Amino acid sequence: GPVGRNTGEVIGVFGTLDWQEAKRANLSTLIGGQSSGITQVSFASSVDVHNLRKIESHLQKLQSPVWPQDILGSIDQQRASRGESIFNEYCVSCHARIDRADPDRRIIANMSRVSDVGTDPRMSENSINAQGYSGILRNQYVGLEVGDILLDRKAPVAALLTKATLNVVATPDPDKWFFQRWTDWIVDITKAFFHNEIKSSIKQGNYDPDTTASPLASLNAYKARSLNGIWATAPYLHNGSVPTLYDLLLPKKCEGDPEDGEYRPDQFQVGSREFDPAKVGLKSSGYKGSTFDTSLKGNSNAGHEYASGKTAQLNGKVLKPLTKDEKLDLLEYLKTL
């Protein structure tokens, strides 16, 4: 659930972990799925699970930002109306339209194989193939979708992170005084394991299912998010390789393409806070910033070229390329989301 997701993010970014052999099994090791009869591990960490849960609770009350017409200019309603029809044909099968004001909404997100959508595969490949030393976690079991795997001397990083996240959530905060520590822990455990309104469900879309031979195969796919507030989230694609929404509607220049065509930039500047309301994104040239080079591994700006007639829809159909005017119509509609 949300608590596990946020805990995993903190561990992956800047959390400090102090894993030590525990003297004996306890309630935390039991909840964390640690096997009896082997070395028990204490998962003390700098992760404040209680605060993460409170932050998540506050985030549930937020709504996506609305295009500020008094600052960035009025939306052309006629263009936006035409763009809505294009969105319905080209986009909505993956990117569900939602009501930003409805806190009880449920979103069915569709998965797309990296090979199908054509975007840079490095992140998904790393999530599946990255290995790390298990240390004192060796010989622990980790429960995955298709069953338990036994951690060897080297094990998939995704499995190690899963084990660490579950046990960090299950461990009381050692920095708090006794009463506060256990009060917060009981509340957090109850909320994390029993009050999660979003239940686990089968993934939807096109992806390779996990199997006993490849227990992390489904990670080789990206999830299509709803596009509410998309105008405010530049740069685009999962690796930030496309600076503006307008550029996202263009194809990547490939060998043999005409030189006078309009393509996604292979290099652009990042670091500006100046917004470009015409292309919908942050200013990406004309200043001294850091250069984003799409030729580097992990930085490719290819793929997701539906508007250019190069990427197939979920049903396998490739739609015709949009004209310049149709792209501007779609861009105008995206401002309204």
Task: Mark where each language-model region is.
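Periplasmic c-type cytochrome electron-transfer domains
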Residues: G1-L337
